[in-house]
Each structure stands twice: as structure tokens, then as C-alpha cells.
Amino acid sequence: IAWVFGVNGKNFIKTMLRIGKERGAASVVDDQIGSPTYTYDLARLLVDMIQTDKYGRYHATNEGLCSWYEFACEIFRAAGIDVKVTPVHSDEYPAAKAKRPMNSRMSKEKLTENGFERLPEWKDAVARYLKEITW
């Protein structure tokens, strides 16, 4: 799993919404790519998995790829918030607490090969998530 967001706890979406409200602008790295993962969708997949004998190691994220910058832009678009989002390179972003991989995409072929339904598109997941939270 990667780039996880859900109703409980802190996550990138909640952080972006807070920054967007407080500042009206955000600087977000545009050179790291991956796939966001909604905990609700992941939980559905895990329930499906435990009802089988298809054990093993799987990669599971919502479908599609984006950069953190594209993720932030979609969050604000889906939330209907007008925020100026500025793309920056990782080496220009001093606030990073941990080094992140430039490419965290994962192959999810094993899911399909074993008959599991892949998680929905990440943009769809963001839209559904925003309906679930109070912000």
C-alpha cells in the first residue's frame, strides 16, 4: 500500500484542506509519483482476500498514478476550494520529514491473476472520501 488516506487519523488530504483554508496557497512536490490508497477500498479488498486461500504478498493501491502535486490539485478541485498550488521539486522542499521514493508505483497484476477486483480509480476515491469527512 502507499499514500494512504482514511477517515481516522492524519493524512495528506486533511493536511492539504487545512493548508488550503488557512493560506489559500500550497507548494507541493511534483517529481514523486505513486498511487493514493483509500482505507475504505483497501478494507473491502482485504475482506475479499481473507475469504479465500490465495495467500501471499500483494500490492494494493487505488488505480492510476499521480504526483503529490497532481494529488493536491485534485483534492482542491473535488472539494471546490480555490487554492493556488505551486509545483516544486523534492530538493526544494525543506519541510520533508522523511525521504520519499521518486517512483512508488506498484504492479497489481497478482491481484488480477488471483481473481481479486482492483481498487477503484484514485480520483473516484478522493471524491467519495471528501463526502465522508467533515472539513
Located regions from the model:
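Tryptophan-centric aromatic hotspots in well-structured domains and transmembrane helices
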Residues: 3, 12, 55, 68-71, ...
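NAD(P)-dependent short-chain dehydrogenase/reductase
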Residues: 1-34, 40-41
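Mid/C-terminal beta-alpha module of Rossmann-like enzyme folds, strongest
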Residues: 45, 52-97, 102
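Short histidine/acidic/glycine/proline-rich micro-motifs that form metal-
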Residues: 2-6, 33-35, 62-66, 93-94
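Catalytic phosphate/metal-binding cores of nucleic-acid and nucleotide-processing enzymes, i.e., regions
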Residues: 40-47, 51, 56, 130, ...
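Conserved C-terminal active-site "lid" loop/helix of NAD(P)H-dependent oxidoreductases
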Residues: 67-73, 90-134
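Hydrophobic "lid"/C-terminal helical patch
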Residues: 16, 46-50, 72-75, 126-130
